[in-house]
């Protein structure tokens, strides 16, 4: 009898070991699957972010990324590597055990926030669920059904859906105007106000009048000009008028010596306030409507309104 008990005990032990081994194999296979589906950043050629309100599609040709809806859009190339790294991290994240019937507990039963990542002809689509206590996020891969814990830093890619494609626009870098490189500045405003400043032997003049000291703050302001946002790329007919750019509050034509030692011009047209402390502007002959901080245009707007006293 003892012999039979020993044999049964051995069989039970073997069965338990087999079951444990099977579970380990399952976990190993899931981990291997995640590793196999990890997409390298350099191989990623397309990203598609979507939610209930919009879809953002990006594709890469050679080394250049494009917004698929309009390939002429000035997409900020410097912003794309961070997005690609975040997408790659998502594909490489480790799986966690979540039963199909428990998906709702992790916010994964009916989520509409997704990211599709394509590399070498293979696409993986991730749906965002709830945030874990660790700060990571539960993500479900549609292609293999795995649920993965993805770092909060990687999941920040979805913040793009809180704004618009204009947040991804490359903004023009304006020249730095200084007392040394300024050649002339013509400022025009309402009521036929027109101020022509020219530099003669290092002295700024309006007619024969020396206005070097009176225009010092203006020159400093011109040297700090920068656009802060893209408001409307390729605006429709009438958009400029809505922004007050058909009858601008100020327009400046500045000539200066560029880094190559040749003469260049900067034309800045300032429209109406945007309601959030900024001004609608256009730069040179580009019809794109940009935004500038109103505080960076105080001297220019004052000169355009009152002239040089």
Which residues does each predicted region cover?
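Soluble, acidic/polar mature domains that operate outside membranes
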Residues: 2-309
